[in-house]
Amino acid sequence: MNITLGYIDPVAFSLGPIQVRWYGIIIACGILLGYFIAQAALKQVGLHKDTLIDIIFYSAIVGFIVARIYFVTFQWPYYMNHLSEIPKIWHGGIAIHGGLIGGLISGIIVCKIKNLHPFQIGDIVAPSIILAQGIGRWGNFMNHEAHGGPVSRAFLEHLHLPDFIIRNMYIEGQYYHPTFLYESIWDVIGFVILITLRKRLKLGETFFGYLIWYSVGRFFVEAMRTDSLMLTSHIRVAQLVSVVLILISVIFVIYRRVKYQPIKYENSGPLTWPIKKAK
């Protein structure tokens, strides 16, 4: 790893012709740490220790695939002329919102198959997801991507950032906003809040709280980024999706509180799939 010239090599090490990149290592570490944290929550509600294995396995696979499809779709003018680049996820280009959609769909399907309550599982994994996202942003840092607009070195020094961050934000002759860091800090704060409040919230509200918290932060950070996926020349996809997620989450939480008066998470115990077929 070369840091002497202010540059961290995205490749951690090589095994023959195979390059092992920091991007993948960091994302894997985020998922692994999130898994262990979620395991502790399983025990607290009385669910079996192996409950999350299938959910995480399939959600991770489907999530990565959908995240890549999502990214490629909005960058199709480039990829249509560079088809060989589509599977190269180690170069970056994984959209979190796409991963969230894919992971959510596969998670619900597995919950149905395993007869698990999706809101309870969502509450269990929500803090882990946002923490993994916060850790994963450091993979963007290593890849020199997902940064904001140009700034001066003096600006970065004014933020009292560690020197290795300042050096690595010097990309092709210019310093840039470390937007990866802003979002990472926001996500870690969200993790602490969700873990702290989870027991006091109604069933499902920790997961929707995650969607709200993450989306608010993403909306503002996205405005600073230079590599946003664009729906039109003025509408950033991530900002639009963030607004939609916030509205859906707020409406759903209010509706469930008024209509169903859901139980608290801490009183839930082991729950099964809540939707029954009409007789």
UniProtKB/Swiss-Prot annotation:
Transmembrane intervals: 22-42, 52-72, 89-109, 203-223, 235-255
Enzyme class: transferase
Any one Gene Ontology molecular-function term assigned to this protein's record: phosphatidylglycerol-prolipoprotein diacylglyceryl transferase activity
Binding residues annotated for a 1,2-diacyl-sn-glycero-3-phospho-(1'-sn-glycerol), in chain numbering: R137
Membrane topology: Multi-pass membrane protein
GO cellular component: plasma membrane
Pathway: Protein modification; lipoprotein biosynthesis (diacylglyceryl transfer)
Keyword Transmembrane helix annotated: yes
InterPro entries, per the entry: Lgt (IPR001640)
Keyword flag Transmembrane: yes
Protein EC: 2.5.1.145
Pfam families: LGT
Main localization (coarse): membrane
Biological process according to GO: lipoprotein biosynthetic process
NCBIfam families reported for this sequence: lgt (TIGR00544)
Annotated family: Belongs to the Lgt family.
Described purpose of this protein according to its UniProt entry: Catalyzes the transfer of the diacylglyceryl group from phosphatidylglycerol to the sulfhydryl group of the N-terminal cysteine of a prolipoprotein, the first step in the formation of mature lipoproteins.
Name the record gives this protein: Phosphatidylglycerol--prolipoprotein diacylglyceryl transferase
Source organism phylogeny: Bacteria, Bacillati, Bacillota, Bacilli, Bacillales
